[in-house]
Amino acid sequence: MNSIGNISTQVTTFASHGATSAWVLAENFLIIVVLMVVMLGFSYRSGRGGIVSLIVAFYGGYSLYTVFPYTNDIIGAGGSPLVKAIISVIIFAIATFIPYHFIQRLVGGGFGVLSFMPRFVLSFLAATFLLALAYHLFHVSNIYTFPDTINHLFAPDGYFFWWFVAPLIGLIFFVH
């Protein structure tokens, strides 16, 4: 009977440790999961080529954001880091919407229907692209403390390039 109690204790310990580890993992990557679900929903809502248009528009928005001569002046007008982050996100959203509007018209009919897996991967890559921009362009880490796991993946400047090109690599593999 003692061995059955011992096995029961081991199983309970394993299950609770596994559940705790799964919860911590989910909590650490919740921001990526939320952004990915939003991107996935957008890809289904926007029709054929919507996620492709959005990813390409992100690059156009990034370009417009960085070359706009008044970006720093407008962001500097915000007093607190929170207001500065909100202003920079709004500027990026406007700079992304302009190319998206035209790219969607050009790309919309050019692609067949993407299956779930390409949409899932492209949504994940778009979400990580936005999170990398949040770290390096919008400085969201000044107003929100991300979990260490996310900080290790997105905070180093050397990783920004890889998160930046990841959606393009995804487009190369999944859109043909």
For every predicted segment, state its role.
Residues 2-176:
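Alpha-helical transmembrane segments and their juxtamembrane interface "caps"
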